[in-house]
Amino acid sequence: MLDPNWTAIGGLFAVLGVPGDRLVRFAEQVPAMSRRPYGLLLTNLARDNVTILEGPKLAEAGLDWTSASYGDPLHGLAGHVVRMRYPQDQVNEVVQAWACEMRRIRPPAVSGLDRDLPYYLDFERIHAAYDDVIRAARSLGDSIENLALLAAASDIGTALKRAAGLLGMSEVPPEKEIADALFRWQAARLVRAAERVPDSLFRWRCDDRVPERDDFPSDLVRRALAVEGVAPADRVFRGTAHLNTVVQLENYPDPVVVRRETAAAPRREQGLLPEHAVLQVIERSGVQVRAPRILALGYDDRRRHVAIHTYEGPGGRSPQHPVDGLLPAEADELVDELAALAEVDHSSLPSNEPEGGFYRWLAERLADFVAALPDATLRAADQRGLPDGDLLRQILGRYKVSDRAPVLLHGDLNPWNLVRAGRQGGLTIIDWEMGMIGDPLYDLVRHLHLTPTRTEMRVRMFDRWSKKLPAECVVGWEEDWRVYRYIEQIRSAYVDLDRMTTGAALSTPNVRRAVDAYEMTLSAATGSLGLRRRVVPKVPASLKVS
């Protein structure tokens, strides 16, 4: 079902956050099933494919045999149950009626029914979700009318919500975002068929904060938007806060990235500086920091804010991230780039010196973040011995750090924001939306906290960093780096617990890894706080949801 459609629609699945290989991965996890005699099946026995004739006793007729197949009778039953969308209280009644009749005419067909049917039901629910998305997208025909887009988006949203857990989706995009994705996909298909970009589509309104560039004028912007919707799935990267689509333009030498904010999982921790402003300052400075260039910023046909950046991955391949830690040469490159950031003139950026210094501001910000967490997350934190915002503020207030000259910071140097062997060669830093002005020590310590780093590598990086940066940027670092490590351990305990409680962004790789290591994170945080960790009773295996 998917293979014939994947070239045309695979990118749309990726934009929606739907993995394309979920059916295959699910099938690989299914244990060996009981043997049952194969027979003729109707794999699409749904309401639209059956006609009930009235008479002395009801009889079905007019069956649609176009989906006929041959195989395990449980497969046919599962397909019928899923496609009929019976209320949950009727499912068992239907299954028992089927089993009763099968025991009468073909007893071996019910062998292993209770054990094997749930696997077939889940498989069919995944299958139906893919099928429903394809059907809804195809139902548009050549239309880009808003009512048609919203209707298709509603159908897709319903299908994805019904199977989100089975698809491995931690959240489903809201219908407005789905409709926008459908518009881009549909309009891009129409443009490709017409072999030109009509004036009525992909109109562009420039954001004055990033004036039109001579090396990337508005006609290139429109062409980038016109091919975004039909980009293949392996060129679409959906992160915790942004959707990035890599496109190649005709007669333009390098790929570019169309970058949009996602609405599904709003980031609780917001950056202080606009990403475009940070990238502009870095580009103007001319320092040796490998970072994207901002090519355009503005609004598309649907009044959605869009940025276009240079693509910093290796040519023709997906970006590679140092998820298992930096190599020695890469560690040196990162330190050198942090030293170069210290040379950037950030006076044009909107930032004020925080009262009480950077660390006090950071601690206050974390305490405010904790106080604003949802009630469910706060209850979960209390159960695990984590303090509320007021007590956390008092605990963090005990620490002091030396004053160091403020510099431009990336703010979130996790491995997925670093690209190996990028366009400019060497290690490239991407995703600058958490940029800020502050203590240069913080960027390095946060990176070491978020990235697997051996002790000898940490010593190497600190030694190089302390020698590369100006003296006013490194004073007192030997005593202070642990304070920043404490605050990052504590932050992770709250951030990861919130994701576990709310389910936000759990499908992204960096979040999955953080959540999987939560027991270690919690132990480190309670140790940093000097508090006793409470024992949270574990749910018995018999009560866990499979």
Predicted segments with their positions:
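Short beta-strand micro-motifs within the conserved protein kinase catalytic domain, predominantly
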Residues: 293-304
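ATP-binding glycine-rich loop module of kinase domains
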Residues: 240-273, 280, 319-323
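Active-site acidic catalytic loop and adjacent metal/ATP-binding pocket
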Residues: 27-75, 237-248, 257-258, 395-442
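Active-site activation/catalytic loop segments of kinase-like enzymes and analogous catalytic loops
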Residues: 74-108, 125-144, 441-474, 488-506
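Conserved short submotifs of the Hanks-type protein kinase catalytic core
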Residues: 302-316
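ATP/Mg2+ or Mg2+-diphosphate-binding catalytic cores
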Residues: 131-211, 495-546
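Active-site catalytic-loop/activation-segment of kinase and kinase-like phosphoryl-transfer enzymes
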Residues: 1-30, 167, 184-199, 353-399, ...
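Conserved kinase catalytic-core helix
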Residues: 1, 12, 19-33, 280-289, ...
